[in-house]
């Protein structure tokens, strides 16, 4: 009988820990973001300037597409026109003026993304944005990279209270 009780307790403990394991696995890492953003920038750069340019942008608007994973997604800013060009989670942002969209502290974070045009290896930036289901802003970090020689910048972000921008920039350099 004691063996059966131990198995039952162990089984219950395992079942109760599964949601925590699933949650931990669903969080994207900065390394994953760097890789996905680089892949997305390459894919977009190849389509821009061809007859497939519109399809190149549309791939980033698909909520169930390859550019949405774990707890994050790829977004695209057209820095030449200063507009949000693609956003799979908030399609109402597409076409909006990137200079007028502010984080919860009043910063034009989407416009800051365009600083990536000047940095060949991309940039990390921080801003405050509500987590899904919340109203107050939480620190969010995003990596942004220019798509080839275009005016498009591709980015993705995660909520993170720990990593510094300097640490993330070093990580980006090591990931080359």
List each language-model region with its residue ranges.
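N-terminal membrane-sensor/transducer module of prokaryotic signaling receptors
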Residues: 2, 8, 14-176
């Amino acid at each position: 009988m004691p063996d059966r009780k131990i198995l039952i307790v162990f089984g219950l403990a395992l079942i109760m820990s599964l949601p925590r394991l699933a949650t931990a696995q669903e969080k994207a890492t900065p390394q994953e973001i760097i890789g996905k953003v680089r892949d997305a920038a390459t894919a977009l750069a190849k389509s821009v300037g061809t007859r497939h340019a519109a399809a190149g942008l549309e791939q980033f608007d698909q909520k169930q597409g390859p550019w949405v994973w774990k707890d994050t997604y790829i977004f695209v800013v057209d820095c030449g026109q200063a507009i949000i060009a693609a956003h799979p989670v908030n399609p109402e942002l597409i076409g909006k003026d990137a200079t007028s969209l502010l984080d919860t502290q009043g910063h034009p974070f989407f416009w800051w993304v365009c600083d990536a045009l000047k940095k060949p290896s991309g940039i990390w930036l921080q801003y405050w944005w509500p987590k899904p289901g919340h109203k107050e802003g939480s620190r969010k970090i995003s990596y942004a990279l220019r798509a080839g020689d275009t005016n498009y910048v591709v980015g993705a972000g995660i909520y993170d209270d720990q990593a510094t921008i300097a640490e993330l920039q070093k990580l980006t350099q090591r990931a080359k």
